A protein has these predicted regions:
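N-terminal Rossmann-like FAD-binding beta1-loop-alpha1 element of flavoenzymes
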Residues: 1-9, 15, 19-51
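Predominantly flavin-linked oxidoreductase catalytic cores and closely associated redox partners
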Residues: 44, 137, 141-142, 146-318, ...
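N-terminal FAD cofactor-binding segment of flavoenzymes
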Residues: 46-111
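Helix-loop-beta segment of a Rossmann-like dinucleotide-binding subdomain
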Residues: 113-137, 145, 173, 291-293
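FAD-binding beta-loop-beta segment adjacent to the flavin cofactor pocket
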Residues: 330-361, 495-509, 518-536, 543
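Active-site-proximal substrate-binding core of FAD-dependent oxidoreductases
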Residues: 357-363, 375, 379-437, 551, ...
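C-terminal auxiliary extensions adjacent to catalytic cores
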Residues: 434-486
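Iron-sulfur cluster-binding cysteine motifs and their immediate structural context
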Residues: 528-560, 567-589
Length: 593
């Protein structure tokens, strides 16, 4: 049993004796694990309580993805669901746009493109027959409703800020952040104490580079335990446009286009990894975005500005004519693949979804693998808890104090024999091949897809962190990006408004310079790398300013702009920023992402 505390601003505190069989730090895989667990419990007439925390203001508010959705795992969980009845908030089917046309282009310059690469020459994993163009956030909202119907408790606007451990160092749950604390660290009139949630098992589905997940990976040595390479990431920047069908005859629902080449790869041995996507979703939306591997070398490169100039290419702009940008956002994604997956279990909890790193970077998809990992997690946890009838939560939903948190080792075993690992094994060396250059990487990916098929007896390694790949500014010239025209391209602060980002101003900063780094780290960043944080952040959080009467620049952190992409915790020189959760409900308010 534990005490679940609410502290209210008017000074009263109430304690409740609630325990949970199963708890989550929220991410895309959350709902599928929660639903599967409740399905198993109800089928066996067990009363088990499941709790989910969502740091966004509502379910789906912090979800951002391409998204061409592969329904394989969704169909496993809902074999009898008619997809036309999976509805968004406006009563439209989330799955109303099946992929009808697949196109892959190599852009040779800002004006030209080579002929489309024939599908027969592309890896089968890039084919999208049977997939759907969707809003992943809308699907999450539907999934949240399904979970609540089954009795899952979802607390939106609560940010998991701390992992809780028992006397044996096993995870016993999480704590949420106190709210109503001012910048000065003192409680305001709106102060509410954070709450502790204790659970028999806690599943961490925080998405790529989750703060609690990263703590657990380090604390339990999960990378070392699995001989995993350092994770490598990409930054995805996305917009949603709505076009006037009377003014744009190029719109075709179900049209899918990916590009490589210009503007990132300007010569055959370019080591900058990345490309673009552009999807047409009924009735009139164009979903488009740009992904840049964060292992790039040039500190002057700006993923956001590369995205903006890419939109001016004729093979892109023709789909935006007569339209308007209605939403903007950004998020990092895992690109390390199979080699970078840590050990998945530890006493009292597990990692699932992109917290573990199951994204397939060749497919440019991770939602289907996140769903599958959630299903496998629920099955493994339920099976373990079922071994001892007395270990189930009792009639008062109290946790048996004598029953210590378990490590669900079967989850690791079951994932390794699942189709997720089979899929990732087939492309395990493809991303690392691009470290030798763009053309060698493309050639290797082709051979791996059509000949080797994952059976190569060697491993191409990613030996270092993305932050270590940045080279000194002296090796490069500053990039002269074109000015945004306000039609196809936009300045960053204008676009940021389309993300709906909001944080309470009077709260402690959630982006903090690590004490062991101090000002020395950012001073070295500006002196050696010319301040790359000014360029890679897709929200204008970091800038170097000169105060009146001063001659030297200083770092200014505009934490209120943060879209929670996590890029700074990855690419910052010396990784000197500690990304922590702000007050729950803050951050972007994505509706269509």
């Amino acid at each position: 049993m534990f005490m679940f505390w609410f502290a209210f601003g008017f000074g009263f505190a109430f304690g409740f004796a609630f325990g949970f069989a199963f708890g989550f730090a929220f991410g895309f895989g959350f709902a599928f694990a929660a639903i599967k667990f409740k399905q198993l419990a109800l089928a066996n007439e067990k009363e088990l309580s499941v709790c989910v925390l969502e740091k966004g203001a509502e379910v789906g508010a912090h979800i951002l993805s391409g998204n061409v959705f592969e329904p394989r795992a969704f169909d496993e969980l809902f074999p009898d669901v008619d997809k036309s009845e999976v509805l968004d908030g406006e009563g439209n089917s989330v799955f109303n746009t099946p992929v009808e046309e697949d196109k892959f282009l190599f852009l040779t310059s800002e004006e030209k493109a080579a002929p489309a690469i024939p599908n027969a020459l592309l890896p089968s994993q890039l084919h999208n027959e049977g997939n759907y163009v969707i809003s992943l956030g809308q699907l999450c909202r539907w999934m949240g409703a399904q979970a609540e119907e089954l009795g899952v408790e979802i607390y939106a606007g609560f940010a998991a800020s701390e992992v809780l451990y028992d006397e044996s160092n096993a995870v016993k749950g999480i704590a949420t952040r106190d709210v109503g604390i001012g910048k000065d660290g003192k409680p305001k009139d709106t102060f509410e104490r954070g709450i502790e949630l204790h659970a028999r098992q806690t599943v961490f589905c925080e998405g790529a580079r989750g703060s609690c997940s990263e703590e657990l990976i380090k604390k339990f040595g999960l990378r070392e335990a699995n001989s995993a390479q350092p994770q490598t990431y990409g930054l995805g920047v996305k917009e949603v446009w709505e076009v006037d069908l009377e003014k744009n005859e190029n719109f075709r629902p179900g049209f899918v286009q990916h590009t490589i080449g210009w503007p990132l790869q300007d010569h055959p041995l370019s080591k900058t990894f990345g490309g673009s996507f552009l999807y047409h979703q009924a009735p009139n939306r164009v979903l488009l975005g740009f992904v840049v591997g964060l292992d790039y070398e040039n500190p002057y490169l700006s993923p956001y500005k590369e995205f903006q100039r890419w939109k001016h290419h004729p093979e892109v702009s023709k789909y935006l004519e007569g339209g308007a940008c209605v939403s903007y956002g950004a998020r990092v994604l895992n690109e390390g693949g199979l080699h970078s997956i840590p050990k998945l279990t530890f006493p009292g909890g597990i990692l699932a979804g992109c917290s573990a790193g199951f994204l397939n970077s060749v497919k440019i998809k991770g939602s289907h693998t996140a769903i599958k990992s959630g299903i496998v997690a629920a099955e493994a946890i339920y099976e373990e808890l079922s071994k001892d009838e007395e270990s189930f939560v009792g009639v008062n939903f109290e946790i048996n104090a004598e029953d210590k948190p378990k490590e669900i080792v079967s989850y690791q075993e079951n994932m390794e024999t699942s189709w997720v690992y089979e899929e990732l094994k087939a492309v395990r060396n493809c991303h690392a091949a691009f470290h030798y250059g763009f053309l060698p990487g493309m050639m290797y990916a082709g051979v791996a897809a059509h000949v080797l098929r994952g059976n190569e007896p060697w491993t191409l390694s990613n030996a270092s962190e993305d932050s270590d790949k940045t080279k000194p500014a002296s090796a490069f010239q500053e990039i002269n990006y074109p000015k945004p025209d306000g039609v196809f391209s936009f300045d960053l602060l204008t676009n940021l408004q389309r993300s709906g980002t909001y944080h309470t101003d009077d709260q402690p900063a959630h982006l903090r310079i690590k004490p062991e780094c101090g000002s020395k780290a950012w001073k070295d960043s500006i002196a050696t790398y010319d301040g790359p944080e000014q360029n890679f952040c897709p929200a204008g959080v970091y800038e170097y300013v000169i105060d009146d009467g001063e001659t030297e620049k200083r770092l200014q952190i505009n934490a209120q702009n943060c879209v929670h992409c996590k890029c700074c915790s990855i690419k910052m020189p010396h990784q000197y920023i500690n990304w922590t959760v702000p007050e729950g409900g803050g951050g972007p308010q994505y509706q269509l992402m």
